[in-house]
Amino acid sequence: MNALKLSVKTLIVLSSLVFSSLALAAPLTVSGVVKSQNPLPANLRIGVFFTDRSGNPSKELSSSSVTNNSYTLSLAETAPPTNGLQALVQDLLDWPGLIGKINITGTAHIARTTIRAYLDTNNDKGFSSGDTLFESFVTKGRGSIVIVYSDAKTRVKADRGFDATLEPGWNLLQIELGNPIKVARVNSVEGVQVEVLGTLGYISSHLLGF
C-alpha cells in the first residue's frame, strides 16, 4: 500500500514537471494597443526585430497587423542563428530599471530584440526593403518589457532589487519600475502600449539580415 502511494506521488510530481516544462515552452505572446498623434494607416504593422550590438534593428523576428489600434505578437520557439548571438556582458544590457552595480551570474550568449512600428508598403505582411520604420516607445503600466534569447541559464541583478533570471531559450520579462523594481519572467503579457514616434533614418536593406 505504501509503495502504491509512493508511486502515485511520484507520478503527480513528474506530471507537474512535464506540464510546467510545456507551459514555459509555449510560444510567447505580447498584445496591446498602438498610440500615435496622427491617424494610423491601414498598412501599419508592429514588429519584433533582432538588434545589433549598438541596439539598431537588424532582422525581423515576428510581426502583427494593427486592427482597431490593437495588435498581438506571437514569438516562435526558433533559436536565432549563431552569428546573431552576443556574449552577455554589462555593456550589452540596456533594460529598463537596470541601474547601479550590475552583477551577472553564469555565462551566456544572448540575442536582444526591440519592438518597432513600420509601414508595410507592399502588403507582404513582413518587413522588406522600402518599408518605413518608426521609432517606437514601448511601455507596460509603470514599466516595460524585454524580449531576449539566451543560450544558457543566467541571472542578472542590480540596484533597487532588480533580479532577472534568464532560462535557455526565449525569455519575456515584465519589468515594473519602483522601489523595489519588480521583474517577472512570463509567457504572455497584455496591455503593452506602443507609441509611434518619428521615422528612423536607417537604410531598409540593412534590416534584412544579421
Predicted segments, located by residue:
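Bacterial N-terminal signal peptides that target proteins for export
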Residues: 2-11
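Glycine-centered loop-to-beta-strand initiation motif
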Residues: 32, 55, 62-79
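Acidic, glycine-anchored loop motifs typical of Ca2+
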Residues: 120-132
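Short Pro-Gly-centered beta-turn/loop motif in secreted/extracellular proteins
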Residues: 74-88, 149-151
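A short, amphipathic beta-strand motif
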Residues: 28-38
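Short, ordered, surface-exposed loop/turn motifs in non-cytosolic proteins
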Residues: 37-54
